[in-house]
Amino acid sequence: MNKKIGITLGDPAGIGPELILKISKHFKEKFTYVIYGEEKTLLEASKLTGIKLNYKKIEKVEEAKERGVYLIDLNVLKVPVVEPSVSSGKAAVAYLARAVADAIRGNIHGILTMPINKFWAKKAGFQYEGQTEFLAKASGTKDYAMMMYSEKLKVVLLTTHIPLKDVPNYVKKEEILKKVRLIRKEFLEKFKFEPLIKVLGLNPHAGEMGELGREEIEEIIPAVEEAKKEGIKVVGPLVPDVAFINPSEEDVFLCMYHDQGLIPFKMLAFDEGVNFTLGLPFIRTSPDHGTAYDIAWKNKARESSSLHALRLIEDLLDKI
């Protein structure tokens, strides 16, 4: 099987082009890599980094019949390097859309998406909160979740980009159950092991028996108990301020809101963190950072997170 990995350029005004060149030094002969972007932009990034990437230009991914590195040049930009703008946002969306279309058809088996900027993407007509939501909609995926992954720590979020004051409205038994079931299904199918799912409480001290909040008693505990009846390895609600001490490799933490999960994750695994989308019909990862316009096109970007994101795709494809 010729296992193909798609890599999107991301926002060309950001650090994506530079990162692709830097991780290309670690490409493996047993995989096929298909870059979705701009040849002229990659050539400029090559001059910047001093890294030469040998690739073959193709029009369609089906032409990538032999193992190697390929480029689908969408030729969206008029110039190689642009400032953050509607043009850069439009280009980033075009690269993503083409890669996703190929993945949905089964022509690539995993996608590494370089960062896009939500502001400029939306200015260019992108109508989604982020790449994850676009991937889910395009693939017809109803149940999905963002997981931050590293060998040290694995964190799944019940809620993502919503105001903290609104979080309790989403801490519901059925929503928790959906995420717990999804985590188990994805780990069994893609990671090939049974996870221990650790569900965190919402309130300080996990509610202190209802004295500090009722969500644990009314929503979280019933969800955990029902999941146990289904044979799922799950515990909770755990007290959030001690839950992350000495995690094991099989632990997956289900956190109630964004910062509850992301603060400990970035403290423990900042340079090796990977954004993994659970629930999609293909593997999708991205680095754990944004476009970093402030250091873009200065050859200052560190490729560690992007390399870990690539390695995770490769490792999972090895399990197929």
From Swiss-Prot:
InterPro entries: PdxA_fam (IPR005255). It is found in: Cytoplasm. The keyword Cell inner membrane does not apply. Its EC number is 1.1.1.262. Coiled coil: none annotated. Keywords: Cytoplasm, Metal-binding, NAD, NADP, Oxidoreductase, Pyridoxine biosynthesis. GO terms for molecular function: 4-hydroxythreonine-4-phosphate dehydrogenase activity; metal ion binding; NAD binding. One of its GO terms (cellular component) is cytoplasm. Its cofactor is a divalent metal cation. It comes from the Bacteria. The keyword Lyase does not apply. Binds 1 divalent metal cation per subunit. It catalyses: 4-(phosphooxy)-L-threonine + NAD(+) = 3-amino-2-oxopropyl phosphate + CO2 + NADH. One of its GO terms (biological process) is pyridoxine biosynthetic process. Substrate binds at residues 132, 266, 275, 284. Pathway: Cofactor biosynthesis; pyridoxine 5'-phosphate biosynthesis; pyridoxine 5'-phosphate from D-erythrose 4-phosphate: step 4/5. Its main location: cytoplasm. Belongs to the PdxA family. Catalyzes the NAD(P)-dependent oxidation of 4-(phosphooxy)-L-threonine (HTP) into 2-amino-3-oxo-4-(phosphooxy)butyric acid which spontaneously decarboxylates to form 3-amino-2-oxopropyl phosphate (AHAP). The active site is located at the dimer interface. This is 4-hydroxythreonine-4-phosphate dehydrogenase. The lineage of its organism: Bacteria, Pseudomonadati, Aquificota, Aquificia, Aquificales.
